[in-house]
Amino acid sequence: MGSDAWVGLWRPHRPRGPIAAHYGGPGPKYKLPPNTGYALHDPSRPRAPAFTFGARFPTQQTTCGPGPGHLVPARMTVRGTDGAPAYSIYGRPRRSAPFLTPGPGRYFPERAGNATYPSAPRHTIAPRNWGVQAEQQSPGPAAYTVPSLLGPRVIGKVSAPTCSIYGRRAAGSFFEDLSKTPGPCAYQVVSPGVYKSRAPQFTILARTSLPQDNTRKPGPAAYNVDQHRKPRGWSFGIRHSDYLAPLVTDADN
């Protein structure tokens, strides 16, 4: 294309910075607070006062007395219930069923076992204090914790002062072994650069190499000289094209 196609001094060039029209943003995805209305208003914008109409309160209804639900007994007077006698009619009591005495066929003497025959006495040795522990609910002497009466920490009792003997101190006493004190070698020598002017220090860095291409290059074995480009070939196409409409005549109808 020649230079005649361009008009003026403008030529296509790469933009200096990103252009917003070239990128697809999320659009109205962010839910920002509105600037209209009173509720959920943007706090960074001024908001005008809003007025509402309140609801009408119902009128208070006064009652003069109890309604039909207040039932007053008929025998109730100003001074209480009247003293007229009242009688009630109870139902007829039900007759009790007669006692059915068992006949001779209800007894089985053969099942009595040793109860009907003489047998030697048998005794059972029960454990000690049988039935006493189950009925006793009071705590024993071991349930109470009595404070000790020995020592200075007795509650409600006067006690004499007590003294305690502590162990000997290894440092500062008269029997301290002074040969175990630290010598001059135990202290670390402070560097003179801390309290004096420090000389400049230099470091030797490693040798830097020029930037170069470190990608892997194919060697001689990567090329196969026996492979050649295949020559051009021909193929037989279909008789009718799929993109051509069939011929329809009046005789076909």
Swiss-Prot record:
Keywords: Cell projection, Cilium, Flagellum. It is found in: Cell projection, Cilium, Flagellum. Belongs to the CIMAP family. GO terms for cellular component: cytoskeleton; motile cilium. STPGR repeats lie at residues 182-207. This is Ciliary microtubule associated protein 1B. The keyword S-adenosyl-L-methionine does not apply. InterPro entries: CIMAP, SHIPPO-rpt. It comes from Homo sapiens.
